Amino acid sequence: MAAAGETHWWYRSTRELLRQLVEPHLAARPNALHLDAAGGTGATGGWLTEHGPTVIADFDQFSLQAAVHDFPGYLAVRGDLNHLSFADESFASVLCVTALCHRMNPDPAAIVREFARIAEPGAVVALMEPGGKRLWRSHDDVTHTGRRFSVGELTAMAQGAGLEVIKATGAYSFLVPPAWLMGIIERGKAKSDVGRNESGLGGVLGALASLERRFLRRFSMPFGLSAIVVARRPL
């Protein structure tokens, strides 16, 4: 997974997308502390370390070791999202990517409420999860995905936690038709997208993702293969 995070087109594109959506809202002070929640190897959140000390919390020790090796600005903490032991108002930002969907997290709304608790007033909380309930595929089974979210559901969870939503959008909309088709073709088979087609059809998918990011600078989409919410804890 660590190697895929460096080379796979989706991880590269996702880092750029998250930067675009989250960076403008980060606290501009040197002592700001950030959290990459369930950050794994840092494949999607390592860029946060450029903005100050960043705690990466994950249950997998090997992933944490890889993250700290690749991003020395990380402070590794072993734990899971269902038992966040951080003090109230600890972080200037909280990032959580493709983790609320996991089977090991039975109550994602409760986790988002915890994010709101540990976020300081004015802090940004960014959530990115698999989108499209009808787009279930064998990749979801292999990666222990327990649920997919609509943009509306992710928005409702953030608002239910008392957060003010800044941006709510779908992403990777151009992947919806092929994902639907692959779901039919792969039915009953155990296959994952990790390590598959790392170049993104020779750069084509990366180029489409770049075009979509330009669109998302000004607009939002109601659907996509991913659902994203960027919110803020009220002052």
Where are these regions (language model features)?
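Class I SAM-dependent methyltransferase Rossmann-like catalytic core
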Residues: 1-12
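Conserved alpha-helix/loop element of class I SAM-dependent methyltransferases that forms part
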Residues: 11-31
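Class I SAM-dependent methyltransferase SAM/SAH-binding core
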Residues: 33-35, 39-83, 110
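A conserved beta-strand element that flanks and buttresses the S-adenosyl-L-methionine
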Residues: 95-96
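A short glycine-rich, Lys/Arg-flanked "PGG" loop and its adjoining helix->strand segment in the class I
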Residues: 109-124
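Short, glycine-/aromatic-enriched active-site segment of Class I SAM-dependent methyltransferases
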Residues: 125-147, 153-156
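Conserved S-adenosyl-L-methionine
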Residues: 163-173
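A C-terminal cap/extension of S-adenosyl-L-methionine-dependent methyltransferases
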Residues: 175-235
